[in-house]
């Protein structure tokens, strides 16, 4: 079953998300998600099996420029995660479809995403789901003080 997450789900989401976004703590993510869930331009979907949360997806509407797109707003997959023991069952595809349907309902005609250059698993997932690669970048910074 897939359902839209509520503020009460923030900790459940964070417990999964910390496995994907390791530079943040579960507590930080739970607080961030509790606020983001309230935003009508964001949605979280939870996939459950036997009443256990086994995956989630986060999507947003982006009105700023999104690489390779021609419309606005654009539905954007911010993150998608399925617990290791539940992978290869089509759950990520189901979560992505929920996000895409939400974006369509919000008036979007395009849906986009990104991944780190080193995340080959995510790259293969996106391509298998019908995404077209539109750019590869490396970002730079330096101190000027």
Where are these regions (language model features)?
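A short beta-loop-alpha structural element at the N-terminal edge
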Residues: 1-13
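Helix-loop element at the rim of GNAT/NAT acetyltransferase active sites that forms part
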Residues: 14-28
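Conserved beta-strand in the GNAT
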Residues: 46, 52-61, 76, 81
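Conserved acetyl-CoA pyrophosphate-binding loop and the N-cap/start of the following alpha-helix
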Residues: 86, 90-98
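Conserved active-site alpha-helix within GNAT-family acetyltransferase domains
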Residues: 93, 105, 117-136
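Conserved GNAT acetyl-CoA-binding A-motif
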Residues: 96, 103-115
């Amino acid at each position: 079953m897939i359902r839209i997450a509520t503020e009460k789900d923030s900790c459940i989401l964070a417990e999964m998300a910390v496995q994907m976004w390791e530079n943040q703590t579960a507590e930080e993510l739970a607080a961030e998600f509790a606020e983001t869930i309230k935003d009508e331009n964001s949605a979280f979907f939870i996939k459950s099996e036997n009443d256990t949360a086994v995956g989630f997806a986060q999507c947003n509407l982006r009105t700023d420029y999104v690489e390779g797109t021609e419309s606005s707003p654009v539905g954007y997959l911010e993150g998608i995660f399925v617990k290791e023991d539940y992978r290869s069952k089509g759950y990520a595809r189901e979560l992505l479809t929920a996000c895409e349907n939400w974006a369509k309902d919000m008036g979007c005609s395009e849906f986009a995403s990104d991944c780190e250059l080193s995340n080959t698993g995510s790259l293969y997932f996106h391509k298998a789901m019908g995404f077209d690669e539109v750019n590869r970048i490396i970002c730079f910074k330096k101190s000027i003080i």
